[in-house]
Structure formats: structure tokens, C-alpha cells
């Protein structure tokens, strides 16, 4: 699965800090402010630099979503009523080991017009201990007939009763007599008939719509990870309960059906209905089961080994699937070769779903996508969109091996799926698009952003205990994905690329079609490398956080846990490793790269075996290959700043990005004076590469936002960064030309120039916006987001806002829609922003998948920050009813409050959480928000004067 909301934990973070603390005032005033804040922009907040690179966000299509926002199907308990009976093992969260499914015969019949479906499933089950009870997962879907139970001989066993134990989402079937172990015999058969609803959510089996030639059409598809297969059909919904499947779909003759496997046969049921039956699958986990009923067209490529690779897409968007088809073939062939293992199925399909809750889902043989992540129009989409499509396609292809062929034993090892896919996606795209510098871009999109998250006390280990569906959902986050990818990058560099590849191949071969744990992967890499992989890497996966290496005299190194909050207790929560790490330290001496293993047992630190002396410089952690930060002595930081100014190309672009990110993070943690960090930015007038500029924008956004309301200082800060970015902004200009990285760079630096009030940049954005409003100009694809944002910000009014909304409704390309959504959110008009928030409840206009994106976009607007947060508070019950507390995007939306910095705002956040204590999948985001706001308040107290003096001294 790809996380569509990655912008909440990757790339530039958004911060808007007030310069004046506000005392806590009475609840009456707070309540009034909460309500009034929706109508007027009471508190000026920051425009974010988020989106300067047109990064990961969400999209939609012209088709209205029919999904009702708040209504639920009527309660119908069927023949298995709810019960609170806790006399058996079904009271436990985990399924028992003695009941094992081996095969499912599943038939489903969607009734599109009624928004319902019916189905039946015959599950072949092995029982290894005597029992009268069988229990399996079921949620929201109901059993319509008393289950049928048969012995291996075929003899029917009378069923005494069935009931739902909703606390653990089980349906329990009680037999009249004992079921004996069937070792050596055939399986038991449990047959259940069921019915469910196709509306109300974007999980399980659901229907959504799109428009084709003015006609509204429907598509029904599934989305099951992590615990939603149980919503589609009764099943043993845990990843280690692998079984084979034979799936049949009964559908209207107007439709076609897809599933994991190729079609085995199609037959007519009557004049209206057809039945499509698919070949028996390989053993797979329930969350990978997928089926869809559609009227789409397709584009196909054939792999080097003859596997058909097909993209299914709305007929009117067929041309936008060409790039996806090409990149799929290239990366697919690369991974078959790299992993040394053929893809396991006879075909691989991909389908773009018009309204899809996540970014993409790796269902074996039928990968489902949000349209923004699969479809690319070279005449309408930006370079960032192209890169996003390539990356998501590669990510999901990795899963066909890591996740599908070998699956984690339990969700606590989710990173074995997602960390690996997040790492290997870069290798796949690097092979297909060789000039994109994808291995270096991993620093920008994964390593450095997640280091910020992992420096909070509210972080968690990569391998983490999970014991509820909400906890399972919550670990689909930056730690599992980006930190997982980052430590694999470090590990690959340590043991060498060749041995890492061999270890991966051995791991896949040994555990093919089975489940595995983190220790199994370490064992495979130890065998390949003959290095202590488990001893080293357990310190990175089994405790949260990471170290900062303090360097003394260029050779002597000690480690300490890095935390953004200098007041935090670095020994909490308890860790068996005491927050020390076994660290493969990479360093360069005379252009020679070396690796020294820093064992955590060396409590006094280590000394690098360097022959350099005097003022020589050892670059520790070149290209930020290790998941740690480096803090040099002040004199060394001064030397780095001087040498950047003299000849910045003496350092690689990745090193320049790393220096800047480390320095600003260390300064936030009060481990380095901000003067030293800011001195590193003096050379930027000469910087011409994407990696450093991307990271500069992220690093300085916190400071820019913090002082935005300081009428004395902010203009000085604004002018400084405007002067620094102007040479590269003017050099690149507003002509959308150049290679891929040049186009990404142009969008970034022009965005910063606009943010810093550069008159030339703003005038260009406004002029292009006005020309676009005439309807006679097609904007350059890589400048559209800038024009929509800053054109709307500078010259937007009701007329231009309405025109933009009309264009949003007219365009069919999802990536263009997401840019227009951002433009609509950038208007400096509280009445229009309030109207925009009201539209979020109209699912015919704003798709269910896009609601949280719009809220985030509005929160980036200085006029909308307070409005967006207040709207969430006032509409929380509506949002919970529409999405459920198990929705990870709902859980994360509270992070839009992270920029707050006053005691009053902190109190408001606490009060909101106390009013709605059930967090569901949002428990960690809530902890993160509270910690971040507390840190912001303290940060202002500790750093305002130092930063003020540095900027004022520039003019002194």
C-alpha cells in the first residue's frame, strides 16, 4: 500500500508560529473564537512552502462520488445476532492456531443500482484440536442463512447457533457436536451466505462513479488492507492465514469482472447476468484478495518473460495510461532480474479507481490505484506527477515479491512490506529513468523528513506491538515506510550492494508463499555478508529514535539520542538497548570512503583511524547514507560555511543538503547555535541544484513561519531569502524548459521566491493567472500549481474563484484537479474559504478521498489556518460518522494544528482531545501534535533573540 497522505510526514513541514504568547482566557471567549474563526481569519498564519515541488497530494476525477457522507445502512443482524458471550477463545484479538483455512470458494454478486451485494463462501478448514466452535472475521456484512458445516467425509454437521462477537469483529459458529482434528484427512467445509452494502465508505467492497460522455457510470472494487477483507466477506483475516482462492463474480452483462487471477471461464446465467470464474490462486493473505466490476478500457504491454501487464482505465482517459504501461514493463522486468525470482502469477493488472481511500494497493495480480498515482498526461501533468506515478508503480511492483510472495507474520513487522517497497521503489525508478538521481532523492523524500518525526518522544519503534485494528492501521506511517527504507539504505551501503541483493534473493527463496519475521531477513543477510547484521540492525528496529554523533578533533566520536526537545528524558520510554545504537559509520578521507562499526558497548566513544592532521576535514556520513545526524565542533561548522561560500561544489549536492538539514535540526534541539546554521545559507546565491534547494526550503520554513507576524523582523528575513533565491529564480525563469530535475528545481525556487514576496515572481504568477482566466491560454504544466496558488492569493476574487471551481468540475485529469483544489484554497477571502469548507460535505463535488486534502490546503492559507482547525473541531462527529475512527487519514488530520505555538492554542487542542477521547487510529498523531506545540512554545522562548540578532546584524 502507498500512503496517499505522505505530505503530512514527508517533504516540507508546515509551521506557523506566533511571536506573542497569549495567556489562557476564559472558556466563553474561547468558544466564541472557535465559532467566529470559521467566518473571519482572526489569526494570521503562514502560507506554507508545501507544494513548491508539486509533491505528493491527492486527486480526483470529474465523476461525482455517490457515497453518502453520513448515512449508514439500516441495522440487520441476520441469522447471527450480536452476543457478548465471552466463554470461548473468540474473546481474544488473535485467531487461534488450531483453526487454519486452506482454500476459499468465493462467489460475489454486486447489485449496482441497489448499492448492495450478496455472496457465498465455502471455506476449507483444517482443525488440529478438538472444538465445537469455529470463529472467523466479519464486520458490517451480515450472514443471511444459518451456516452449513461438513466433515471431511462430506457428512453435514448440525450447527447449533451462530452469533457475532463484535468486540473482536468475529462471527462464531457453534456445532452440535465436537469437531475432531482432521489430520491426514480432507478439510472441513464451512459454508456461509452473506450480504453487504456497496455504499458508505471506501473500504471493503464498494461502488463509486465517474462520468463518460456526460453519462454517470459505476465501478465496484475492493480495498482490504489491513483489516477490511472481513467487511467484504467472512474470512480468517490475519496475514499468516494464507490460503488459495477460487473467485467467481456474478455481474450484469454490461460489465466485466477482474480479480487476482486470469479468467478461467465466462458463462451466461440468464438474460441479465453473467458469471466470471477465475483460476485458482496461489496461497495468499486475505488483505491481498481483490475483485472489481467495471466498464473500462485497457492498455497492455508484455514483459520479457511473456507476462501480460495491463492497465485498466476509463475509456476517455486511455491515453493517460501509456506512461504507466511503459514504466510498468521496464520496472517489472528489472525486479524479476534483481530478485532472481519470476513473478508468481500468469498476469498482472492495474486499475485506476475514481475514488480511492489510499494511494494504491498491491493486491496480487490486480493492483488498485488512485488516479493521480497511475495516470499521466504529458500535455497536462507536471514532472512531479510523472515521478510520483513512476514511484508508486515501482512501490506496488516491489510488493509482488516483498509482501505478496513473502508476507510478514504479523502486522508488528509491517516494515518488511512497506519499508522494503519504499526502498526498492527508488531502485526500480532509477533503472527506468536514469537521469532522475532517484537514489539521491531518497534523502529528500524519506530519510530527512522521517528523521524529524523520529526525533519526537511520540515516535515508535519500527517493530511495534499492535493489538487492535486501530493500532494496526496506525502503523501505516512514516516510521514503517520511510524509516524502514532509510535503514535498508544504510544496511545496503554497509554490507555492499552485491551482498544485499544476494541476501534478498535468499530470503525470498527460503520463505516463498510463506510468512516471515524481521529475524528471518537478518539471517538471510548474515548468511550472504558474514557480518553481524542482526546485532547491528536490532538496535535500529526495536527501539525508536536515532543518534547524533558528536565529533571532537575530527576523530573522536560519541553518540547520544537525538531529540528535538532538549528538556525530554532521553531514557524514556524504556528501551532494552538504552537508546544506544550499533552504527556503521561511513566517512571519507582523501576521497577514500571507509566504514567503521561503532559498537554500542563502547560507552566512551570511538576514535576513527585517520591519518589526517591539523585542519583537515573528515566528512562523516557522506550523502547522509546513515540514519543519524552529525554535530561537529563550532570551528568545523564555521569552516564548512566558509568553504560553501568559496566553492560549494567541493561537496556533493547530497552533502550540501545534509549539512543544512543537520545544522538546522541541531539548532532546533539547542545542540548548535542558530548562528552557525544560518551561516550555511549565505552561499545560496550560488546554489544551482535541486537537492540542496529542496532541503533549504524545508529547513528554513520553520523560522520563516515563526517570525511571520513580527513586523520588525519578518521583512528582514523575507528580504534575505528573497535575495538568496533571486539569482536562481531569475536564471531559470518562467519558461517551462529543461530536463526533469531542472523542472523540479524551477518549481521549488519560484515557489520560495513567491513566498518571500519577490515582485517579479509574483507579477509573473498573477499575469499568467489573469491570462488563464480568459480561457485562451494553456499554462505550462510545471508552473500551474504556482500560478493557481499565487495568482489566486494575489488577485483572486469571487469571480476568479468561481471560474477555478468550474475548471475543477470540467477537467477529467485527476492531477489537474488536485492543483485546482490547492488554488481554490489559496484565496485571501474568508467568505470564499468558508464556502469551500461547506462544500466538503457535498460528495458530488469534493470526493470522499479528497476531503482531508482540501482541509490541509486551506490550513496552509494564512486566512484559513484557524478556520480549518475550527471546522475540524465543530464537525468532528460528522467526520467520524463518515470515515470511522479506524481511518488513518482522519486520525492524521489533527496534525494541521502542529504550527500552533501559544498556551491558549495548546489548551484548545487538549480540550478538543478531552472532549473526544476516542482517537482510534489517530492516537499517535494526537501525541505528536501535543508534543510539537509544546516544543514550539519553548522554542520561541529559547531562540527568538539569537535569530533576531543574526538577521538584524546583516543590516547592521
Curated annotation (Swiss-Prot):
Chain residues that bind Zn(2+): 395, 399, 418
Keyword Ribosomal protein: no
Residues forming the catalytic site: 396
Biased composition (Low complexity): 49-62
Modes of activity regulation: Substrate specificity is modulated by calcium which enhances the enzymatic activity for cleavage of acidic residues while reducing its activity with basic residues. Inhibited by aminopeptidase inhibitors amastatin and bestatin.
GO MF annotation terms: aminopeptidase activity; glutamyl aminopeptidase activity; metalloaminopeptidase activity; peptide binding; zinc ion binding
Gene Ontology annotations for the cellular component aspect, listed alphabetically: cytoplasm; extracellular space; plasma membrane
Keywords: Aminopeptidase, Calcium, Cell membrane, Disulfide bond, Glycoprotein, Hydrolase, Membrane, Metal-binding, Metalloprotease, Protease, Signal-anchor, Transmembrane, Transmembrane helix, Zinc
Family: Belongs to the peptidase M1 family.
Functional note: Regulates central hypertension through its calcium-modulated preference to cleave N-terminal acidic residues from peptides such as angiotensin II.
Protein name: Glutamyl aminopeptidase
Source species: Bos taurus
